[in-house]
């Protein structure tokens, strides 16, 4: 059943209470269920360069789940607990998705806009009391790692 307006949506929501729907209650549960249901289906895709020989890197749902668990385990091994912040200053990339999901599963994910000035980045890191900061290695035409180091 589709919907075209708010009234349609409200009618759909009245059919079954949210609590009675068979939905995962956590991000990890949602990721696991999707990976089990559609393991080989593409989940995320990113292409860093656009040359004729460059190809996108695509992760299936199974790969996304596996790598997300690895990221969450890494953050936990660094001492991240459920109330700790994993900040990241990253461009769009598959690694960014893994950091977001793994950080949210291990603790609290805090994306920081890489276009901000180092002073602003530093203020956010102090305000959130980030336990871990994830950024990228040096990359041509990008000053993200330098900004993160300066912050």
Model-assigned labels for residue ranges:
Residues 107-151:
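Structural core segment of the AMP-binding/adenylate-forming
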Residues 31, 98-99, 148:
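Aromatic/hydrophobic pocket-lining residues that form π-stacking "cages" and hydrophobic walls in ligand
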Residues 76, 100-107, 126-127:
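Short hydrophobic alpha-helices that are characteristic scaffold elements of the AMP-binding
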Residues 2, 22-47, 66:
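A short N-terminal helical cap/helix-turn-helix that marks the beginning
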Residues 40-93, 97-100, 117-122:
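Conserved AMP-binding/adenylate-forming core of the ANL superfamily
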Residues 86, 103, 133:
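Conserved S/T- and glycine-rich ATP-binding loop of Class I adenylate-forming
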Residues 8-17:
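Short, contiguous pre-domain boundary segments
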Residues 17-18, 50, 138-141:
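Short histidine/acidic/glycine/proline-rich micro-motifs that form metal-
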């Amino acid at each position: 059943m589709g919907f075209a307006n708010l009234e349609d949506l409200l009618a759909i929501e009245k059919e079954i209470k949210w609590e009675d729907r068979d939905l995962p209650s956590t991000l990890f549960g949602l990721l696991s269920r999707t990976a089990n249901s559609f393991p080989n289906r593409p989940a995320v895709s990113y292409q860093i360069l656009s040359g004729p020989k460059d190809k996108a890197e695509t992760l299936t749902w199974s790969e996304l789940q596996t790598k997300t668990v690895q990221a969450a385990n890494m953050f936990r091994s660094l001492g991240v607990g459920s109330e700790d912040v994993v900040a990241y200053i990253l461009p769009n990339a598959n690694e960014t998705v893994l950091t977001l999901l793994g950080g949210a599963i291990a603790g609290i994910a805090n994306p920081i806009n890489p276009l901000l000035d180092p002073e602003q980045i530093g203020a956010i890191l102090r305000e959130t009391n980030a336990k871990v900061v994830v950024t990228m290695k040096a990359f041509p035409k990008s000053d993200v790692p330098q900004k993160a180091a300066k912050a």
